[in-house]
Amino acid sequence: MGDDLKRKILLHNLSSNNPILEKLKGGQEPNSNEEGSDSIGDLPSLKNDYKRQDNNSTNCTYIPPSQWNTYFRSNEHIKVQSRNIEFNTYYTVPSSILGPSLPVFIFHHGAGSSGLSFANLARNLGDQLNNNCCCLSFDARGHGGTKFIDAKQAQNYFRDDFVDDFHTLVEYFVSEKLKHLPTEKLSIIFIGHSLGGSICTFTYSKLSIELKKQVIGVAMFDIVEEAATLALEKVNHFLQVTPNMFSGYEEAIDWHVSHELSRLRESADIAIPALFKSTESGKVVRITNLETFRPFWRTWFSDLSKSFVSLPTCKLLILAGNDNLDRELIIGQMQGKYQLVVFQDSGHFIQEDTPRKTALTLVDFWKRNDNKNVVIKSNWGSSNKV
């Protein structure tokens, strides 16, 4: 049987027999009946190394339809001198834990995106879990509100640079922001979209032994090594047809929705403005120029599929539409090495297009793979009374 036929059969069976999707009967994501075409893929002790400042203001007069505090409790800038970066972070941390386990969802966006791409998903996760969960999202280097502390230093965007950033931030966040919570109850899941999936995958091996014990899984959204590598060859065309400037934020939102780069208006209202900054003329310009990353592209996805499949933790891959698996992923799926879910009604930005369905899938993934939730009842010594 040829590889193409294997892929089609495998993806068809998974998309048509997905128990999580049954939960959505009677309630669909808005605009979920429109399939459309996908866009190119998005593309030691740390305590004294950080300085923090609250960020409750915006650097422009535009007030978006949705603001970050609708989705997260905190928006904080965290300086990491050793990385020469001030991270713009968004997070929600509960004051206590209800139950045997607290799921901690840590997100990493893809190239050209921002931490607020996960805003609507984070809110849906909170709704599904009655706010008994933790969510962390942030802007990666070269994106959104994250800045280099010393702009004169070399600014590289190799995969290892993103990985080291993510590793450093995660270790700090868990040790400082979650220190009031029982460590044994934390169940961390890394979730990466496109390039973010690659970063999450390669970060796992760098974690401390203690943190690895708390990570119960890694999830990747719409990323397949073979397809992503081929997509890089089309980036020039993508850059040519994608405007970098709009008359205002509303026009930018409208354009992205109309071109199905973000299919759900509710998600676009919070995710798209974070991709732009205002100019003196009143127009808005895109913060991230993907052309800047060109010298580093080839490092982003190399050896991803094999590395993902071989991760010594639970794994989830969610694909949009009819994306094909490559050879390593096909073999891994047939061997039961990871869970595969296909959303036929989503574009490339799964977390934006289908936030409710994605949240349900992540909650199910957590429940099935977290042994803290397993309660074994014994009938030993019990007797039946008549």
UniProtKB/Swiss-Prot annotation:
The keyword Hydrolase applies. Keywords: Hydrolase, Serine esterase. SUPFAM superfamilies: alpha/beta-Hydrolases. It catalyses: [phosphatase 2A protein]-C-terminal L-leucine methyl ester + H2O = [phosphatase 2A protein]-C-terminal L-leucine + methanol + H(+). The keyword Oxidoreductase does not apply. The active site is at 194, 222, 348. Belongs to the AB hydrolase superfamily. This is Protein phosphatase methylesterase 1. It comes from Candida glabrata (strain ATCC 2001 / BCRC 20586 / JCM 3761 / NBRC 0622 / NRRL Y-65 / CBS 138) (Yeast). The lineage of its organism: Eukaryota, Fungi, Dikarya, Ascomycota, Saccharomycotina. The gene is PPE1.
